[in-house]
Amino acid sequence: MTRSITIARRELGSYFCSPIAYVVMAVFLLTCGFLFWDDFQPGQIAAMRNLFDWMVWMLVWTIPVISMGLLAQEFATGTIETLMTVPLNETDVVLGKFLGSFGFFTVLLAPTLLYVVVLALFSVPGIDLGPIASGYLGIILVAGLFISIGLFCSSLTRSQVVAAVAAVAVLFTVTIAPWWISGKIESDFWLNVCNQTVFKRYTDFSRGVIDTGNLVFFICSTAVFLFLTVKVLESRRWK
């Protein structure tokens, strides 16, 4: 685990040397700020549910950008061979890359806590921290899953652009497509499919409901994609 943390620190530091990271941060925070301000009404009941729901859609486009170079860049520059010659195994590399990207996302998300302070100061009759805390937990779980998917896509190619496009396609398929289809096709099958999607499972968190089944879903799904990424790296080692 120590070796993974070392890689994570290196990865996190590399984000702040990239102009793309600052562009992503600016766009994400400006969009969140606009959505919060548009929904905020002083003197009304404090709520961040609408902002949290919009964040999920934003992550479909944001996460692929911050995860596209996690492994694809290493393959393109040839540094993956150097990385794998030191006493590291594939699991160390994958966990380190994941934790580094996840760490950057927490930095990206942290400024939005200012909105909680604003709600606490100006909302009536006060602020209920339960739904807000569960909403943040849900966003963190969704981001973890999306980063693991982005990391997996990055392990399949040497091109960062291809990795980003592939990640967007996968995230669109598991998040937006079922929701859109369920609104167009009225059938029990698509209704059941929609109930199992990422967005549907996340909405429980945004309403203040922490369901064990949803926790298991996000954690296990993230673990599956990390496992698949490890297997891809192992297969590349023997080529």
Where is each model-derived feature located?
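Residue-level recognition of transmembrane alpha-helices
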Residues: 97-98, 135, 167-168
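Terminal transmembrane helical anchor/hairpin motif
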Residues: 40-45, 163-232, 239
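Hydrophobic/aromatic residues in alpha-helical transmembrane segments
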Residues: 63-67, 115, 148-149, 198, ...
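Alpha-helical transmembrane segments of multipass membrane proteins
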Residues: 11, 114-121, 148-152, 172, ...
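Aromatic- and glycine-rich beta-strand/loop motifs that create alpha-glucan
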Residues: 1-21
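Secretory targeting signals
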Residues: 32-37, 43-46, 58, 100-162, ...
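Helix-loop-helix units of permease transmembrane domains in multi-pass membrane transporters
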Residues: 70-100
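Long, hydrophobic alpha-helical segments
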Residues: 51-73
